[in-house]
């Protein structure tokens, strides 16, 4: 451990500057205007993998943005760890809410503020620097492969094809991902599962054009009003989702599982204070931990229609739109939930409007085994680095590739994230603690060490 700490201390300035350089690339995969920047980011990542000691580094072309592959095979008889991450980021909007430019990393109070600081540039780059550390100190105990994609934030639409076409190249014993969070740096945790996702857009159309609200208001259905009513009807008075069949396949936690989940440290007042809300909201009968990790949800991600510019324009809009995401739990299937939503949405629509539902992307929920060699290696690594055992938690987010790895490669994933829920992922002023960045670089080599040792027992 001291060797690791010494190397990080000696090179921490350069390691931070390299991360800053990565964060300056506006690699927004959702917006075509950033295409050149996304491609430049891919080349930068490939260059840094080569500099760190990776071999057979390749910028692999896809129908979308490239996937970066690299490896270091020290001994074919040794176990292999496949590291996954993504170099694309969410759009920075709304820009006016950022205190500093989103693609000019700024340090305040020991935290790096930039889009992608935590999700996922800061976290995947820890693995690149941890790999460099092991190479430079001659302590790499197992084989390592990297697969860093550029389309995670838009559903990883080309990753499945790449994995299917490269099964031999991607052959490994475990996948290691840092794209999740810890409870806190005082209470380290390991995520034992992720929710799935169904993401779609709905369109409600009324008249064939925007109308004068004085001339036609009261006689013609307003699509914005209809859409708002339809969305509101999808939760009952207990905040239970009302789509028929939505909960049919949900596996309820046992009382023992619920008790274990809710034993994690949690300060509700601090939680509310951080979010600046007076009261929490959610499905009745479940705790915050359960609602955000083990229960399915339906959320409106965006809603618009009519005139939203400066000043006033008295129109009755022709159309209204919403983007909706549903987080899923084990046994629910993304495509099935999308179909249930679509059927219900069309059924509850009045005859005065027309409905269109467009699926975007989805992913399946996963649960990772806590009795595996890889999970035990992560436990030991975190305990040595932090001085205490990690608390098992269930993550509320979705990483569709995890289920894909299991289905196509037959391997499980370890979710060893170093972010915090308060890091404002997908929001203005995203941040990542510098302490967490260095702590990750120190902890990751320990995972490889213990994974290699436990694999030989």
Question: What are the roles of these predicted feature ranges?
Answer:
Residues 78-145, 439:
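Active-site metal-coordination/substrate-binding segment of hydrolases
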Residues 189-205, 414:
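Flexible glycine/proline-rich, aromatic-decorated loop/lid segments
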């Amino acid at each position: 451990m001291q060797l690791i700490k010494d190397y990080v201390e000696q090179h921490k300035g350069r390691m931070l500057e390299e991360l800053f350089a990565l964060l300056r690339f506006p690699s927004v995969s959702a917006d075509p205007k950033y295409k050149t920047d996304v491609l430049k980011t891919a080349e930068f990542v490939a260059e840094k993998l080569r500099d760190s000691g990776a071999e057979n580094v390749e910028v692999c072309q896809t129908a979308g943005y490239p996937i970066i592959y690299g490896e270091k095979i020290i001994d074919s008889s040794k176990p292999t760890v496949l590291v996954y991450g993504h170099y694309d980021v969410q759009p920075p909007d709304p820009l006016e809410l950022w205190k500093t430019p989103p693609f000019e990393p700024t340090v305040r109070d020991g935290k790096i503020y930039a889009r992608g600081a935590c999700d996922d540039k800061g976290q995947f780059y820890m693995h690149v620097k941890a790999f460099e550390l092991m190479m430079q100190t001659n302590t790499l105990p197992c084989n390592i492969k990297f697969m860093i994609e550029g389309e995670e934030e838009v559903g990883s639409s080309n990753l499945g094809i790449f994995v299917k076409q490269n099964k031999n190249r991607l052959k490994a014993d475990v996948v290691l991902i840092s794209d999740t969070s810890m409870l806190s740096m005082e209470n380290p945790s390991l995520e034992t599962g992720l929710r799935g996702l169904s993401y779609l857009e709905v369109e409600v159309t009324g008249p064939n054009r925007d109308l004068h609200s004085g001339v036609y208001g009261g006689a013609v259905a307003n699509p914005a009003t209809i859409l708002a009513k339809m969305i509101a009807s999808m939760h009952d008075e207990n905040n239970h989702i009302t789509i028929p069949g939505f909960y049919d396949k949900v596996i309820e936690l046992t009382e023992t599982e619920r008790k274990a989940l809710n034993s994690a440290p949690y300060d509700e007042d601090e939680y509310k204070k951080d979010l600046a809300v007076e009261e929490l909201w959610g499905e009745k009968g479940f705790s915050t931990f359960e609602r955000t990790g083990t229960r399915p949800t339906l959320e409106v991600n965006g809603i618009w229609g009519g005139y939203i510019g400066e000043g006033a324009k008295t129109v009755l809009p022709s159309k209204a739109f919403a983007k909706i995401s549903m987080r899923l739990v084990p046994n629910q299937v993304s495509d099935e939930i999308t179909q249930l939503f679509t059927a219900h949405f069309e059924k509850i629509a009045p005859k005065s409007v027309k409905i269109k539902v467009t699926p975007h992307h989805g992913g399946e929920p996963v649960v990772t085994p806590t009795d595996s060699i890889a999970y035990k290696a992560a436990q030991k690594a975190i305990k040595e680095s932090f001085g205490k055992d990690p608390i098992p938690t269930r993550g509320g987010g979705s990483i569709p590739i995890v289920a894909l790895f299991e289905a196509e490669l037959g391997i499980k994933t370890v979710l060893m994230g170093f972010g915090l829920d308060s890091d404002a992922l997908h929001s203005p002023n995203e941040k990542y603690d510098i302490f967490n960045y260095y702590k990750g670089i120190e902890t990751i080599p320990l995972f490889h060490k213990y994974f290699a040792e436990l694999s030989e027992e």
